[in-house]
Design a protein with these regions (language model features):
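N-terminal secretory signal peptides and thylakoid transit peptides that target proteins
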Residues: 2-21
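An N-cap/entry alpha-helix motif that binds or orients negatively charged groups
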Residues: 34-105, 214-239, 375-377, 383
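Conserved, mostly hydrophobic/aromatic
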Residues: 57, 114, 135, 195, ...
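Glycine-rich active-site/cofactor-binding loop and its immediate structural neighborhood
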Residues: 109-145, 149
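A gly/proline- and charged-residue-enriched helix-loop-helix capping module
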Residues: 137-158, 164-175
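Alpha/beta enzyme core
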Residues: 180-312, 328-330
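C-terminal helical cap(s) of enzyme catalytic domains, especially alpha/beta-barrels
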Residues: 299, 344-362
Length: 385
């Protein structure tokens, strides 16, 4: 006689229910209504989105979820992954899988990187410190958002992280002011500067504007600087490759340029001294190009020709997404919204759970494709759909 299932925890019950044919017969609205109440219940990182929306006030959720204009680029970032299919393998011993990558002489356990964020929301208002603790536990590289550093100095973040973090810079036309920040970060022991160049004044963030109508609270009641009002933003349309050269000449840190989508821009960045490129459209928040970064990535990789490492972000939700980006030539990938969902709903435990799920899925897909190391993931590992 078969042993009855053990329902000693809610998680085990949910797993049993998910395997039942009755579950697949439920109407879509019934499946969408369930919201996880703790990180351990999550089956994938997408389940943290609804939990975050439930936890956040309308304006905060609007800031976290908005794109620009009609959110076409925001949607394209996810839809783009469907343009590529995996070439799975069989009868390959994948008992031992090495997911590690090396970036500027430092070895990391996975190619998954925590992207910077201007504003973070969490139950205990710990923000980037909670993210740093989760990054330390999961041994993940963290990029500290420059706006976050104003409330949590980089040395505090490094202490919570247990090691160096990279720093995201929003340079302004007041170069002396920019250099004060650069020198402070360099003296703190930051090895890499990530210069973000894709945010110009006048963006049309319609989603957040709509949801702000439903929220009468003052921004100062929950965070010191209202989103998108950081000093110097209005001056960023005056920056050029001369700014990049001045940055490179003024610091010993490696300088990556984040926000590149066009191969011509990528080539010019390398010619003007960039140590790396991050292909990014700011999560669909920069401009309404309507194009996914996963589709821009191969063009950038081709023109860079291995002169510098190329990273990519936007739309990553699955281990398969990570695999596809590496096959297209990315050295590593950055995730943003998923860990921010985890943070908003459950604090550092939510961030840690998101990272653990992404790591587990990536490990699994490497095994399914017969890969023992990241170096074995090549363009031949995927096919254009």
């Amino acid at each position: 006689m078969p042993k009855p299932p053990d329902f000693h925890s809610r998680r085990h019950f949910l797993k049993f229910l998910a395997a039942s044919p009755l579950f697949s017969a439920l109407p879509p609205q019934a499946l969408q209504e369930y919201i996880i109440s703790n990180p351990a219940e999550a089956i994938n990182v997408l389940e943290f989105e609804a939990a975050a929306r439930k936890a956040l006030p309308p304006a905060h959720w609007g800031y976290l979820s908005t794109g620009v204009d009609d959110d076409a680029t925001l949607r394209a970032n996810r839809e783009g992954f469907a343009h590529y299919q995996l070439r799975t393998r069989r009868l390959v011993d994948t008992t031992n899988i090495d997911m590690s990558v090396e970036l500027f002489g430092t070895k990391w356990e996975t190619p998954i990187v925590l992207a910077p964020s201007g504003t973070l929301f969490d139950p205990k208002n710990e923000g980037v410190i909670a993210v740093a603790r989760a990054a330390q536990k999961q041994k993940i590289l963290q990029i500290l958002g420059g706006i976050q550093e104003r409330s949590h100095p980089i040395d505090e973040v490094m202490k919570a992280r247990g090691g160096p973090v990279w720093y995201q810079l929003y340079a302004t036309q007041q170069f002396d002011s920019t250099m004060q920040t650069v020198k402070k970060i360099e003296q703190a022991g930051c090895p890499v500067l990530v210069w973000t160049v894709d945010i110009l004044p006048g963006r049309n963030l319609e989603t957040v504007q709509r949801l702000r109508r439903l929220d009468s609270r003052e921004c100062s009641s929950c965070h010191p600087t209202p989103p998108n009002t950081a000093p110097g933003r209005a001056a960023r349309n005056t920056l050029t490759y001369e700014t990049l050269r001045r940055l490179k000449d003024s610091t010993k840190m490696k300088v990556l340029v984040k926000g590149i989508e066009n191969p011509e821009d990528a080539d010019l960045c390398v010619q003007n001294g960039a140590d790396g490129i991050i292909v990014s459209n700011h999560g669909g928040r920069a401009s309404e190009s309507g194009r996914a970064t996963i589709d821009s990535l191969p063009e950038v990789v081709q023109v860079v020709r291995n002169r510098v490492p190329v990273l990519v972000d936007d739309g990553f939700r699955r281990g398969t997404d990570v695999f596809k980006a590496l096959a297209l030539g990315a050295r590593a990938i950055c995730i943003g919204r998923p860990y921010m969902w985890g943070l908003a709903a459950f604090g550092d435990a939510g961030v840690e759970a998101v990272l653990a799920i992404m790591r587990r899925e990536f490990n699994l897909i490497m095994a399914e494709c017969g890969k023992h190391s990241v170096a074995e993931i090549t363009p031949a590992s995927i096919i254009r759909a």
